[in-house]
A protein has these predicted regions:
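Intrinsically disordered, low-complexity, mixed-charge
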Residues: 1-173, 177, 184
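Internal gly/pro-rich beta-alpha loop/helix module
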Residues: 60, 145, 160, 168, ...
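A contiguous, well-structured pocket-lining segment that forms one wall/lid of small-molecule binding clefts
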Residues: 173, 180-182, 430-468, 580-730, ...
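A phosphate-binding glycine/aspartate-rich beta-alpha loop in the early core of alpha/beta enzymes
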Residues: 230, 238-303
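Short glycine-rich phosphate-binding loop at a beta-alpha junction
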Residues: 232, 474-486, 728-739
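Conserved phosphate-binding catalytic cores of ATP/NTP-utilizing and phosphoryl-transfer enzymes
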Residues: 276-281, 334, 360-365, 391-392, ...
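Conserved phosphate-binding/catalytic loops in two-lobed NTP-binding clefts
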Residues: 483, 498-510, 732-736, 743, ...
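Glycine-rich phosphate-binding/hydrolytic loop that grips phosphoryl groups
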Residues: 507-529, 533-535, 574-583, 710, ...
């Protein structure tokens, strides 16, 4: 019998695709079958209305799906008696793993409906929502290949699972109170070593070491938060540390315990109404906050600096923005609302549960070993997390998401490039904000966020995550790409894998990541601005102009170098860079530093001696450290307690000035007319920093000078790009690197370049910071293999 055979490629597993196909076929009297093949969904359809099926695939597919290609052909097959979903089978080809999906509106409604059988069930899900990547063992996506495989469905759940009219038809994690995982608390007043020993001896029996289960556990966690305590909560991709975001003492205590004096905490708010009460939210931001990913979104805090703000001042000290998200897992919704008569606050701190620099805790044992000293009670569950996954964090630029950390909800969605390349490559990524990327032909799969590799627990997490993703993607890389820094842990990891290793320059990888995201492979002028990267000349780079293709680059400019003295301390203490620049560019440097209160005379002399004797000193073109220096000069931040603190504070000062003065005209530019744009082919950034210092000592406004620094630096960048463009004929500029998280500098630079008729590539869903360089490394590896 004539049979229409359809293959659908894309995100079609874990999103209710097979049930959708089954319903369409039943409605249109189409007989046949649908199955997962691992890399695609295959449909065999017999009947007069197969056009209706094809139309539904093109126009009415499940909203969580992403269809990249549909291939249709006809074959002669035996007649089918009905339409069925058949057992998944593996086949070679492209693989698409669905990210975890936030709870849908229908499940949320059922969760709080007393008449529903899943009323207050902490693991409610359906074909449209729930865990995917974090519970997956291997493809195709079926229950037996997930951590839900150990939970046998009850008859009622199984009926829903097998009924085409049910929203839970073929929903792999489906469960209920009778057959699903359970929540429980761990009492931390007991000896931690004894509890860990109980876990090791009873890995499948949480009752051996838990104190309360079910509703009692949830109520205990809620009461602890109300009482000002800190609760570790196991979510979809790991544990969070939660406390009352309106309780200043609780927030300050969490800061003290985590040794995190200033870095902002993420806040989970009860509802969109709550967010709008505290923050300014536009339409695009609201759509993302309420969408299936539900990331942390950076929003302007209406109450920042207000003494009458209900929110704790210590949430984000000195920061006009808040990182805000909505509850995306049922257990988080139940923390806000439960049938126990307790009244919860509308906002909770919800920060990753990890020791500083380490990956997010995934198991009970992780939590007990690493964060038991940070928390008063652990609210856990017995659904195993296979792959840890932090919350994604995003800003907005030009009405689109501008990713800071790409993880839950987005990873491991692939970046598809147009060149038809072949091969499998593993890119290890950066030392900080590590993610890795696996390239399989023209699909590049960036991983979820791992952490900073200076912590060996992050190195272990990287190795484990790489192995799991290779299993999920069913690929064995033939090449490893890593950063060229000889002392990075990522270099060690790459060299330990027993595969050929290619090392590429850090800032070149940044530009390649921007090119890959934009699917642009002609030659570009790359402006790669960040904190640090190992240069070809063994100095520190970070303010680079590169002429780039996917197969190579040429350094064609940089900011003016300075001496960075003090090793790791110089990356946290901007006053050192400021003093160095002033010393080497002013006759009366010591006096200027004294007047600016940058450092003592003794410290000034010590830095000068270190530089002259080449002790722990290196030549640097780091634009990140330049921002730190100007922040110190203006008395905003002399040192940073977390990466980017000083430079971000400088941006906030500039934005505050622009907002308060409705700044339009660039009349401040005249104050800088006596400094060159470039010096010996490099941006005259040292002269700019010195001029900022001179004007500040003359009494010029701090905010104006902060804004002027951004504006003049932007003009310098654009002038350099224009010069390179005229010489080379290249009309496209790619802007990447962590400094371009600064949306003020990004906007000023992009506007100026566009006004000159220059095309500008920027990031959106791939971070401009080191969390994105693995994508660039993977792109280079693919072209390397295909051009050998």
């Amino acid at each position: 019998m004539n049979t229409c055979v359809i293959r659908v490629y894309g995100i079609v597993q874990g999103v209710g695709f097979r049930p959708f196909v089954s319903r369409v076929c039943l409605d249109n009297n189409i007989k046949g079958s649908v199955s997962n093949k691992g890399s695609y969904v295959e449909i065999h359809a017999q009947g007069d209305n197969t056009d209706a099926l094809f139309d539904a695939l093109n126009h009415h597919a499940p909203k969580r799906s992403v269809i990249l290609e549909i291939i249709k052909k006809y074959a002669d097959e035996e007649p089918y008696e009905d339409f069925s979903i058949i057992e998944s089978e593996k086949d070679e080809g492209e693989i698409f793993v669905s990210p975890d999906i936030a709870i849908c509106d229908e499940c949320k409604e059922e969760l709080f409906n007393p008449k529903d059988r899943r009323y207050l069930h902490p693991f409610i899900n359906c074909t449209n929502c729930g865990p995917r990547l974090t519970i997956l063992d291997s493809m195709p996506y079926d229950r037996v290949r997930t951590s839900m495989g150990e939970f046998e469905m009850c008859p009622v759940c199984e009926k829903e699972y097998t009924s085409p009219e049910s929203r839970r038809y073929d929903a792999q994690p489906v469960c209920c109170h009778d057959c699903g995982p359970e929540v429980y608390t761990i009492d931390l007043s007991k000896d931690i070593k004894e509890i860990i020993e109980l876990i090791k001896n009873n890995p499948k029996d949480f009752r051996a070491y838990s104190s309360e289960t079910g509703s009692a556990a949830i109520t205990s966690a809620r009461k602890a938060i109300i009482d000002g305590k800190i609760v570790a909560v196991k979510g979809i991709g790991g544990f969070h540390l939660a406390c009352d975001a309106t309780n200043e003492e609780a927030v300050k205590r969490l800061r003290m315990l985590k040794t995190r004096p200033m870095k902002p905490f993420a806040v989970m708010m009860r509802s969109m109404e709550t967010i709008e009460k505290y923050c300014i939210v536009n339409g695009e931001q609201k759509e993302l906050l309420e969408g299936p990913q539900k990331p942390i979104v950076l929003l302007e805090n209406k109450t920042a600096g207000r003494k009458d703000s209900p929110l704790a001042p210590s949430l984000a000290p000195g920061n006009p923005t808040l990182g805000v998200m909505l509850p995306y897992a049922p257990i988080q919704l139940l923390l806000f609302d439960y049938n126990d008569s307790l009244s919860m606050p509308d906002a909770l701190v919800m920060t990753s549960a990890n020791a500083s620099g380490a990956p997010i805790c995934r198991t009970d044992e992780d939590a007990l070993n690493e964060i038991s000293s940070f928390t008063d009670i652990i609210l856990s569950n017995n659904r195993k997390i296979r792959l840890r996954c932090d919350d994604s964090v995003t800003d907005f630029f030009e009405g689109k998401p501008y990713m800071i950390r790409r993880s839950r909800g987005f990873a491991p969605l692939p970046v598809m490039i147009s060149p038809k390349v072949k091969g499998s490559v593993l890119a290890i990524g950066g030392e900080l904000k590590n993610t890795f990327c696996i390239a399989k032909d023209s699909l590049l799969y960036p991983s979820a966020y791992i952490g900073d590799m200076e912590d060996l627990r992050s190195v272990d997490a990287l190795n484990a995550s790489v192995k799991r993703m290779e299993t999920l993607l069913e690929t064995e890389p033939s090449l490893v790409v890593c950063d060229m820094h000889p002392l990075y842990h990522t270099t060690e990891v790459a060299e330990s894998l027993g595969l050929p290793v290619v090392k590429i320059q850090h800032h070149y990888a940044h530009i390649l990541s921007c090119m890959a995201e934009n699917n642009y492979f002609d030659e570009v002028i790359g402006v790669s601005f960040d904190g640090t990267g190992y240069g070809d000349d063994a100095t520190i780079w970070g303010g680079e102009f590169l002429k780039c293709t996917p197969t190579g680059y040429e350094r064609v400019g940089s900011i003016e170098p300075f001496i960075q003295s003090g090793g790791d301390a110089s990356s946290k203490e901007g006053w050192r860079i400021a003093a160095s620049i002033i010393r080497d560019n002013c006759d009366n440097g010591e006096e200027i530093c004294r007047k600016l209160d940058l450092c003592s005379d003794t410290e000034y002399t010590m830095l000068a001696q270190m530089a002259s004797m080449n002790i722990n000193s290196v030549r640097s073109t780091s634009s990140g450290r330049l921002f730190d220096a100007v922040s110190a000069i203006l008395g905003i931040r002399k040192q940073s307690t977390f990466e980017g603190e000083a430079s971000t504070s400088l941006m906030f000062e500039a934005m505050k000035y622009a907002k308060e003065t409705h700044f339009e005209k660039r009349d401040h530019m005249s104050r800088f007319s006596d400094i060159s744009i470039t010096t010996e082919g490099m941006l005259a950034t040292n002269a700019l920093a010195v001029k900022i210092a001179e004007l500040f000592l003359q009494g010029e406004d701090r905010g104006m000078l902060a804004y002027a620094f951004h504006d003049v630096l932007s003009a310098m960048i654009v002038d350099k790009c224009s010069t390179i463009s005229k010489i080379t004929g290249i009309k496209t500029v790619a802007l990447s690197g962590g400094v371009f998280q600064n949306t003020l500098l990004l906007r000023l630079t992009k506007e100026r370049l566009n006004s000159l008729g220059i095309n500008v590539l920027t990031h959106s869903l791939i971070p401009p910071n080191d969390g994105g360089i693995a994508l660039g490394q993977a792109l280079y590896g693919l072209f390397y293999i295909n051009n050998k």
